[in-house]
């Protein structure tokens, strides 16, 4: 018998017809990958979710129940869903560190209103406005604002008032509370009512982030294509990096890229980034933006991951994040952004509608093992394309040759036999390359064909070894043009 049946035995005498199905040739074309996003963050004690266990989240209302109203995670989910409602979002909640401290800040109002007006106070991008009448004292205005803030259970701070001073305390412990921005009069046209002023003490003294080792345990053996991480302390990043590198490796092949954001001055961000060299981390610098960096990380991941899931090689530049940008005086110019990009930091610009948009999404990888500049893993599109190529190759081999015997090239094989040879595998890889070429992910078939090497292992007759040189399609990023004009 030359045909390799899967279920029909050869020792049959009972009549008559036995037909089986074999799906190894059913699927053609590059495979469709199902992308999963995992969000890390802090839950409150009021949330019903169990810390350390990932849970699928489909809506903001669900997140508030799972992680607590005003929690870091609830607001991160809200931001993510506002930017991407289709990707499969999972959340891995973490308890705050028992030894941690909550960030605090304050707003001190002084003076007495001499004219009616509106007092505007923004907290973490949420604008609280109260009417002021002539003669209102600082204590009266502070009391009005405190009531507004206290009534909002979704703001990440708790507000108390004593006289003319509003004290704000983060709802959760950890360093991320220090990212909560406090400011007055953000929007054009807003101003203090005549006779009133405010002195703001920025949020500070938040300390000790949740235990990242709990998060890593919670990752399990699932394939998380994209991870959103709000914790940027060195210890947490080192633990996460080690796990992501293992996942990227050939034995696990469940790789993922981690998206983060960092608040700080240009010097602070570049100094931070240049201490790292991580090809599976992508960090966006926010500068003095009204919303916390953890919300920027959520929006950044939502728009970039959404694009990469559709086409991993297409550049993500100009993708819009519906966030509040820094004031015009706090926006970085081209030389500053160029420096950020050479420091391993992704950048954004602000469009005509005052919306931040991705300018360049890069990884934090800058140097090779010898400390020399290395652009091999610079762009997130490269990481995403490599991940998909490996998935496509693995899917093709496991789909076409799941239970095949292995023979040398030139072996006489009967029709229908489940036998594969190095040449058959080589031809299958060439066919897959042409499909990926039409999909706009690779180029230069002739070079690939000439350099593709497939052999049967000389020490293990059950193993095939392959060496290939895929030429990845790049992104159109720079257009340079010199005009030599004639008069």
UniProtKB/Swiss-Prot annotation:
Domain of life according to the entry: Bacteria
UniProt record similarity statement: Belongs to the myoviridae tail sheath protein family.
Function in brief: Major component of the tail.
UniProt name for this protein: Mu-like prophage FluMu tail sheath protein
Source species taxonomy: Bacteria, Pseudomonadati, Pseudomonadota, Gammaproteobacteria, Pasteurellales
């Amino acid at each position: 018998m030359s045909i390799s049946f899967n279920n029909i035995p050869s020792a049959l005498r009972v009549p008559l017809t036995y037909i089986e199905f074999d799906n190894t040739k059913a699927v053609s074309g590059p495979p469709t990958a199902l992308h999963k996003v995992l969000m890390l963050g802090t839950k409150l004690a009021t949330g019903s979710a169990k810390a350390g266990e990932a849970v699928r989240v489909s809506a903001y209302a669900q997140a508030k129940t799972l992680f607590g109203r005003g929690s870091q995670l609830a607001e991160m989910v809200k931001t993510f869903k506002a930017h991407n409602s289709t990707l499969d979002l999972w959340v891995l909640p973490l308890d705050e560190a028992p030894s941690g401290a909550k960030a605090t800040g304050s707003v001190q109002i002084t003076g007495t209103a001499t004219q009616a007006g509106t007092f505007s106070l923004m907290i973490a991008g949420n604008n609280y406005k109260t009417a002021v009448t002539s003669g209102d004292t600082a204590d009266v205005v502070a009391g009005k604002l405190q009531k507004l803030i206290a009534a909002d259970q979704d703001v990440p701070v708790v507000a108390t008032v004593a006289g003319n001073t509003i004290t704000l305390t983060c709802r959760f412990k950890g360093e991320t509370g220090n990212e909560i921005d406090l400011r007055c009069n953000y929007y054009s046209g807003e101003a203090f009512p005549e006779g009133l002023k405010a002195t703001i003490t920025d949020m500070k003294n938040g300390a000790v982030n949740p235990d990242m080792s709990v998060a890593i345990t919670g990752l399990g053996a699932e394939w998380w294509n994209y991870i959103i991480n709000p914790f940027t302390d060195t210890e947490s990043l080192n633990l996460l990096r080690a796990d992501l590198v293992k996942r990227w490796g050939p034995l696990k092949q469940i790789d993922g890229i981690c998206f983060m954001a960092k608040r700080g001055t240009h010097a602070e961000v570049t100094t931070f980034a240049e201490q790292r060299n991580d090809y599976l981390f992508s960090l966006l610098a926010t500068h003095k933006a009204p919303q916390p960096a953890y919300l920027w990380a959520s929006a950044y991941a939502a728009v970039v991951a959404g694009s990469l899931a559709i086409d991993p090689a297409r550049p993500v530049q100009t993708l819009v994040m519906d966030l509040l940008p820094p004031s015009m005086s706090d926006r970085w110019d081209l030389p500053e952004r160029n420096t950020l990009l050479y420091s391993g930091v992704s950048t954004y610009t602000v469009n005509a509608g005052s919306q931040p948009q991705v300018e360049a999404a890069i990884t934090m990888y800058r140097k090779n093992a010898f400390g020399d500049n290395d652009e091999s893993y610079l762009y997130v599109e490269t990481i995403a394309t490599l991940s998909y190529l490996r998935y496509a190759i693995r899917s093709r081999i496991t789909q076409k040759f799941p239970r095949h015997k292995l023979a040398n090239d030139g072996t006489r094989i009967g029709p229908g036999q489940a036998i594969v040879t190095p040449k058959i595998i080589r031809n299958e890889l060439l066919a897959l390359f042409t499909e990926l070429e039409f999909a706009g992910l690779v180029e230069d078939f002739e070079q690939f064909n000439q350099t593709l090497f497939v052999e049967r292992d000389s020490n293990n007759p059950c193993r095939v070894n392959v060496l290939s040189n895929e030429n990845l399609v790049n992104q159109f990023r720079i257009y340079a043009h010199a005009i030599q004009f004639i008069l």
